[in-house]
Regions:
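Chalcogenol-based redox active-site neighborhoods
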Residues: 1-179
């Protein structure tokens, strides 16, 4: 990926307005909404972080809650929004956000993995039974331009480890203070 990669055209499939519980675990009654990359990233400074999957140990127990707690610190440094993206569908991402009691971070579904593929972060996790997933990373995006990437160690297909540190909110905040 070039040093300053511009995020141009991409449509994300969100579910909005689902409120009627169905089967004890899924909420329905809403509708599909296309949200473009333009809407998410144009004229904004955004921290986007990606992780292998909703409801997984590091993602649920450490990464997502840490970003939600650090939200005000990001805002104080001029960040407009903090987004979490994962190769999961909108139903999964919404259920995960609800289960995590998110207050600040917005979750973005990348069910088809197209955005992750365009970012060059799509990896195989067949060794864990996950299939195609995102590598763990974070990005500082300013008006659709990726200004900085924090990519976890060991990038590759079917790795045994699950490194987490470079893309942690603490590390990103430390770097943002120096920019």
């Amino acid at each position: 990926m070039p040093q300053e990669y511009i995020i141009e055209h991409h449509n994300f499939k969100f579910r909005v307005g689902d409120s009627e519980e169905k089967g004890g675990c899924t909420f329905i009654g809403g509708e599909w909404k296309d949200v473009t990359a333009q809407e998410l990233f144009k004229n904004k400074k955004v921290v986007l972080f990606s992780l292998p999957g909703a409801f997984t140990p590091t993602c649920s127990g450490e990464q997502l809650p840490a970003y939600d707690e650090a939200y005000d610190k990001f805002k104080a440094l001029g960040v407009d929004d903090v987004y979490c993206i994962s190769v999961n569908d909108a139903f999964v991402m919404n259920a995960w956000a609800k289960s995590q009691n998110l207050k600040n971070v917005e979750v973005i579904p990348d069910g088809s993995a197209e955005f992750t593929r365009k970012m060059g972060m799509l990896v195989k996790k067949d060794n864990l039974g996950f299939g195609l997933r995102s590598w763990r990373y974070a990005a500082l995006i300013d008006n659709k331009i990726i200004k900085k990437l924090w990519i976890e160690e060991g990038f590759g297909d079917n790795t045994s480890g699950d490194s987490y540190g470079k893309s942690s909110p603490e590390n990103i905040l430390k770097d943002l203070k120096q920019l």
